[in-house]
């Protein structure tokens, strides 16, 4: 095997490329308000042609830097942009304008002359043919090359200054151990996607990286070789795929620094193989035994191995004789990286006694990324689906699991809880936590910088950071065990990791804060950039709805940690299955739907925040019903337009039976036509952490400012559906998963809104335990409340409750 191997990656063909560009031209013309008079249309052509000329000048300036055999994708995009401008003008002059009625009858010589000049410019343009050739001849395959470990070791020894190594693994793995090289950086594989350019790698992927990494990457064009490597034994498909994507970005998507003089290579077989063969690496002491224990006799790096990898051919044939064999110590050089011990966590909240385990008050189990044991005996997904879709009784073995369904944890419990699951060997950090006696404060008091109309984000962050079970998993790094790199629905850990960074910064500045000490506000700009990268809605400085941001953040964290995120969505129920489901009690049907939901959506976020409600339509003629089940992490309840109301009025409004208007009547599948019908919502699952949005804005964005009275202690048991016929039915064949009344809650956070949706301001109140009490947060400012019920406010918009017993 040679020192370099070509890896072909199929890219867009010339035919596909031209088809895509012509589609964009047509889309522009369809979307644009094209003038219907000759002179204005000619003027628009002149403006677009000016843009075309500018694009051609950019191409001319960039062309000398381009290798004809290795054009960058940035250069291709310049040519594509120019081609788009040309084709828009071409279509307008050759097709659109001659079709205008005014054109054939127009006697204005000035218009005729202008048209002739534009056509002449179009047909005599000297650039378009060259632009077409670049687009047509852009490589159909991108050649990625690999380098053998022996050759890399030799190059590091003799030409180390000419090499930049990029470790494409999570930073935690990089810190534990990486190839020994002074010019090395780490780019997390979850921090970029295939559409990125080198500029986005610098501005997004490296946003939280050390300054040295950013400096090395900004000087990447000064290195003769860039070597990428990952670990082929961990997250195999994802990390290898991301490494190849990064190589393509650097070779083809380099916009600000084309690497025409730099060769990009990928280390063959990754980091584990490098260590196994005796390559030099830097490691924390705690990882040394693990890395070396599985290594066989080094294949290179030892004088006793004359036939080792160092006898292979060099990257450059003419350098073979000038590169003598390198003798390397078989014991890698170690740089000790001390790991801080992870402490226990402290909360001012009083410890609430847990009920003793029994049928109605089950025990709490630890979180595990495996599917629920209540379905573990069903061996295949199809079997699971069939069981969940029918009324057939589930195996009696499942009944025993009912004793393990859990209730919300008391505040002295160490980790987020999830239903009873098979155990998996998790990170040793959990044991470190349990074995350490140090105590940390979870009631963080620190302000957040407002970097421009981001108060909607700050108020939600303050309330979520008041959720101890959520904060705990991001402080002790438990969340890292559950990032799903294979899921196509999340950001592959990008959002979760940056949320963890923010939480740790808030903890660093806001833990153990004395009442009379003012802390430095925490910067949120990096976290907001990541949010804007994932959802462009949050990329600018426009004001947004805080409850929508809360929904976005919880959904994003869930998808990053979703253990079943890579599974296909379940098929919809058949008509027969729906009919059978309608015959069930509401408790049984909703529990089955929840089990189906967990098969594709299973995370600690679901465990903490997710609830469920049923929506039932009923025909008033034949009484046929149809019930659907929806999950929620933020429950939006309507605010009645009255002078005064309390939150239970909102829940009554939410769950009342509504007679549908003529325009909204349900098309009854039994009557086979639209009939007078009703709709009713019932809450079928109440979560541990209940987030309630008071719907103050109507469809026209008019705000209802009525003062909604909400209590510190809230009992929602009457609004938890036992059954539509009010029968208390106990299901013995499916787990309760904590859905055992009563459902009593305690308020711990309030997000407030004053003003209009587009011109208002967001603040928050958060409970910091009995010693510190309630605090008011207004971006970077904070203070204790000035009177005991200040947090009960007319401006309340989103309420945060936690379940108690």
From Swiss-Prot:
Organism superkingdom: Eukaryota
Domain Rhodanese: 159-283
EC number: 3.4.19.12
One Gene Ontology MF term: cysteine-type deubiquitinase activity
Pfam families: Rhodanese (PF00581), UCH (PF00443)
Catalytic activity: Thiol-dependent hydrolysis of ester, thioester, amide, peptide and isopeptide bonds formed by the C-terminal Gly of ubiquitin (a 76-residue protein attached to proteins as an intracellular targeting signal)
Domain USP residues, every copy: 446-804
InterPro entries, alphabetized: Papain-like_cys_pep_sf, Peptidase_C19_UCH, Rhodanese-like_dom, Rhodanese-like_dom_sf, Ub_carboxyl-term_hydrolase, USP_CS, USP_dom
Region (Disordered): 359-380
Swiss-Prot/TrEMBL keywords: Hydrolase, Protease, Thiol protease, Ubl conjugation pathway
Entry annotation: catalytic residues: 455, 761
Enzyme class: hydrolase
Example of a GO biological process term: proteolysis
Gene Ontology CC: one annotated term: cellular bud neck
Note: Present with 300 molecules/cell in log phase SD medium.
Similarity comment text for this entry: Belongs to the peptidase C19 family.
Protein name (Swiss-Prot/TrEMBL): Ubiquitin carboxyl-terminal hydrolase 5
Organism this protein belongs to: Saccharomyces cerevisiae (strain ATCC 204508 / S288c)
């Amino acid at each position: 095997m040679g020192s370099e191997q070509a890896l072909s990656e199929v890219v867009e063909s010339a035919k596909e490329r031209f088809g895509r560009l012509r589609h964009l031209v047509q889309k522009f013309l369809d979307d644009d308000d094209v003038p219907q008079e000759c002179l204005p249309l000619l003027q628009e052509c002149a403006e677009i042609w000016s843009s075309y000329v500018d694009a051609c000048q950019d191409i001319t300036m960039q062309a000398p830097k381009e290798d004809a055999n290795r054009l960058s994708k940035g250069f291709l995009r310049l040519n594509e942009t120019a081609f788009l401008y040309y084709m828009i003008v071409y279509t307008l002059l050759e097709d659109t304008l001659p079709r205008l009625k005014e054109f054939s009858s127009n006697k204005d010589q000035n218009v005729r002359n202008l048209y002739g000049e534009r056509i002449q410019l179009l047909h005599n343009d000297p650039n378009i043919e060259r632009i077409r050739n670049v687009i047509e001849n852009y490589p159909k395959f991108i050649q990625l090359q690999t380098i053998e470990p022996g050759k890399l070791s030799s190059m590091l020894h003799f030409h180390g200054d000419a090499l930049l190594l990029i470790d494409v693994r999570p930073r935690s793995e990089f810190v534990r151990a990486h190839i020994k090289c002074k010019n090395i950086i780490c780019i997390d594989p979850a921090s970029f996607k295939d559409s990125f350019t080198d500029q986005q790698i610098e501005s997004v992927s490296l946003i939280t990286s050390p300054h040295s990494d950013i400096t090395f990457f900004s000087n990447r064009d000064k290195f003769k070789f860039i070597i990428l490597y990952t670990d082929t034994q961990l997250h195999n498909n994802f990390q290898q795929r991301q490494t190849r994507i990064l190589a393509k970005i650097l070779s083809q998507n380099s916009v600000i620094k084309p690497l025409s003089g730099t060769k990009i290579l990928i280390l063959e077989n990754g980091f584990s193989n490098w260590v196994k063969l005796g390559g030099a690496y830097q490691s924390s002491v705690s990882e040394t035994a693990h890395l070396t224990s599985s290594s066989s006799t080094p294949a290179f790096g030892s004088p006793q191995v004359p036939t080792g990898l160092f006898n292979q051919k060099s990257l450059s044939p003419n350098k073979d004789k000038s590169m003598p064999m390198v003798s390397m110590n078989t014991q890698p050089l170690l740089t000790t990286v001390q790991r801080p011990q992870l402490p226990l966590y402290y909360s001012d909240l009083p410890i609430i006694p847990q009920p003793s385990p029994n049928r109605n008050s089950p025990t709490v189990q630890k979180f595990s990324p495996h599917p629920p044991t209540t379905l573990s005996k069903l061996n295949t997904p199809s079997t699971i689906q069939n069981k969940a879709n029918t009324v057939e009784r589930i195996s009696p073995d499942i009944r025993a699991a009912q004793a393990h369904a859990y209730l919300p944890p008391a505040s002295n419990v160490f980790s987020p809880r999830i239903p009873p699951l098979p155990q998996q060997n998790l990170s040793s950090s959990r044991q470190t936590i349990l074995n350490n006696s140090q105590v940390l404060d979870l009631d963080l008091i620190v302000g957040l910088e407002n970097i421009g109309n981001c108060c909607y984000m700050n108020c939600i962050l303050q309330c979520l950071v008041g959720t101890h079970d959520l904060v705990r998993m991001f402080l002790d790094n438990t969340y890292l065990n559950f990032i799903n790199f294979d899921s196509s629905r999340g950001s592959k850990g990008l959002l979760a990791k940056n949320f963890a960074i923010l939480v740790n910064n808030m903890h660093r500045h806001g833990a153990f804060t004395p009442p009379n000490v003012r802390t430095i506000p925490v910067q949120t700009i990096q976290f907001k950039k990541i949010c804007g990268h994932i959802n462009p809605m949050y990329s600018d400085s426009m004001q947004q709805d805080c409850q929508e941001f809360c929904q976005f953040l919880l959904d994003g964290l869930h998808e990053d940690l979703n253990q079943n995120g890579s599974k296909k969505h379940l098929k919809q129920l058949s008509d027969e299955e729906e009919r059978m489901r309608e015959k069930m009690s509401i408790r049984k049907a909703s529990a089955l739907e929840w089990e189906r939901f967990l098969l594709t959506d299973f995370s600690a976020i679901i465990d903490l925040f997710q609830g469920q409600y049923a929506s039932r339509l009923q025909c008033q003629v034949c009484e046929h019903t149809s019930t659907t089940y929806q999950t929620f992490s933020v429950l939006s309840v309507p605010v009645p337009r009255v002078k005064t109301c309390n939150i239970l009025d909102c829940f009554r409004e939410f769950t009342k039976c509504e007679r549908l208007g003529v325009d909204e009547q349900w098309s009854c599948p039994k009557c086979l036509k639209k009939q007078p019908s009703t709709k009713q919502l019932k809450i079928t699952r109440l979560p541990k952490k209940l987030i309630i949005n008071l719907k103050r804005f109507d469809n026209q964005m008019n705000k209802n400012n009525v003062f909604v009275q909400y209590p510190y202690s809230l009992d929602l048991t009457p609004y938890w559906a036992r059954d539509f016929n009010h029968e208390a039915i106990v299901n013995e064949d499916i787990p309760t998963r904590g859905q055992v009344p009563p459902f009593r809650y305690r308020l711990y956070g309030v997000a407030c809104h004053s003003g209009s949706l587009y011109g208002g301001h967001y603040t928050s109140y958060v409970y910091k335990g009995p010693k510190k009490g309630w605090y008011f947060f207004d971006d970077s400012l904070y203070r204790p409340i000035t009177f005991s019920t200040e947090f009960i406010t007319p401006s309340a918009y989103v309420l945060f409750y936690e379940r108690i017993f």
